[in-house]
Structure formats: C-alpha cells, structure tokens
Amino acid sequence: GVACLCDADGPSVSGNTLSGILWLAGCPSGWHNCKAHGPTIGWCCKK
C-alpha cells in the first residue's frame, strides 16, 4: 500500500510521519479506517 496521513499524525502531510497505509480493498486485519471525516474506505491505520 501507499503511505497516508492518519488523523493522529498531525494536520498536514508535510513534516509529519505518515503512519497509515492506503489500501484499495479495505483495511487488513488489525487495522482500521483512520479518517474520521470524508471518505474512509482504504485509509488504514494500526489500532
């Protein structure tokens, strides 16, 4: 997957660690959708 910004990482993509992974077919086991707003499918962060 491609790294993505989790809500817990900070407000912007630049200067923050991207701890999420963008999955096209939902989140793998042990992960959850990390975006509390907007489209959440595929934006996965570790629980």
Swiss-Prot record:
It is found in: Secreted; Nematocyst. GO terms for cellular component: extracellular region; nematocyst. Its main location: secreted. Disulfide bonds join C4-C44, C6-C34, C27-C45. It holds the Pfam family Toxin_4. Keywords: Cardiotoxin, Disulfide bond, Ion channel impairing toxin, Nematocyst, Neurotoxin, Secreted, Toxin, Voltage-gated sodium channel impairing toxin. GO terms for biological process: regulation of signal transduction. It comes from the Eukaryota. GO terms for molecular function: sodium channel regulator activity; toxin activity. Belongs to the sea anemone sodium channel inhibitory toxin family. Type I subfamily. Binds specifically to voltage-gated sodium channels (Nav), thereby delaying their inactivation. This toxin is active on a variety of voltage-gated sodium channels (Nav1.1/SCN1A, Nav1.2/SCN2A, Nav1.3/SCN3A, Nav1.4/SCN4A, Nav1.5/SCN5A and Nav1.6/SCN8A). This is Delta-actitoxin-Axm1e. It comes from Anthopleura xanthogrammica (Giant green sea anemone).
